[in-house]
């Protein structure tokens, strides 16, 4: 975009202006009948250029501009109104493709330039241009370079201009009290390109500030360069509500200061409804995207609710079904008939006693008398089957059993839990009762046959006794533990101290060992202190003697 130096002469500005007007004139010659409109536009542009040159200040940091004198107001207003009327009548300028975003124009923040050097379409069309008089590339350089206009007239709406060389990660407007530093294009971006001709243009001079520093309190207080077109501060022509700001771009994050500023500065009754139209890129820059968390109901939260609902529906359906009583049998028919007589004869009021009396009388009846009631019961069943063909006794009894299960299930669960806890937490020495009081904890057989046979004092078995089978008579409740005793004896014989244990047992006990059984207790099977505990228990235990019954070889 051609720029003017602060000290540039009128001749240089005139030459540039004439060249650009010539280009625009060639482009506008394609549509006939626009000569008068072209002349009016040229007059307005030249007057604007003269104003900007006359009112430019010498300071580089000046960002405000005073409105033009009162004498030129009427003249410029007439020019612009006439130009606007002719543009609308001739339909020379088309409406913007994105009509719903009047406050901030969002360009494609990344990738302004195509590989061939031309400007991308998204960068060309990022501004709304209902009336592109002030936004055309030919006149952009003719504005005051020291105090560039922050806003263009887009359908008479003040729009903050986004500079071409803003960094992609820079937010659209920085709300701070500090001024922007003089901007230079970053290294990864090529110089600015004229969107009409494709010719690279010199960037903004380093001594010029292409931005307006906007603070939360300063928006709406900066004097507009075209003050004769903008209404006063208290009466904005077009207002922008927060909803209109956010609606076309829901991913834009607007902080609290911005929302309060917009809602307080502008009234929401004059803004046209925004259209649902996205930018050409369709994807906002990640630097200005606010994270949106979608809350989706999980399946785990839904399934229990559905399960309970289905159960409730089934229960309601069951309750809606009428309760059908089963047909009465012969005894019930007799009770129904004779109950009133028994109640009248007896002074008893308890139903159990009355039922007992009726039962005795029923059994005292003869077969012929009972046959009458059996016949009545058969007819009752036939009538019931005709009235309720699909009924079965399981319908009633199933409900009762179901109710009982529901009532008993928590009790049974607690009962089984307490049982398991008792078994788990019993100590090892108290897991079995004492042998004197417990019948099932004791065997009438020696603990280890090897211990009895290995003792020198024990009588040697003869050949006939060895050949004959040995029958051990045990108590009935102890037979189940016989195999366990043999396995325990085998383990005891395999232990390294079995020989010493057998000798120790045989010396004090001697031959009476066969007449005294050794009980199989948990203390004997315990790994620690196996044999001393058994020796301590031997004198205390008195049980029935072991009877050895031998069979003859015949």
Swiss-Prot record:
Residues 445-464 have a biased composition (Low complexity). Residues 408-554 are annotated as: Interaction with CTBP-B. Residues 17-32, 52-73, 407-416 have a biased composition (Basic and acidic residues). Residues 324-392 bind DNA. Residues 1-73, 183-213, 391-475 are annotated as: Disordered. It comes from Xenopus laevis. This is Transcription factor 7-like 1-A. The keyword Zinc-finger does not apply. The gene is tcf7l1-a.
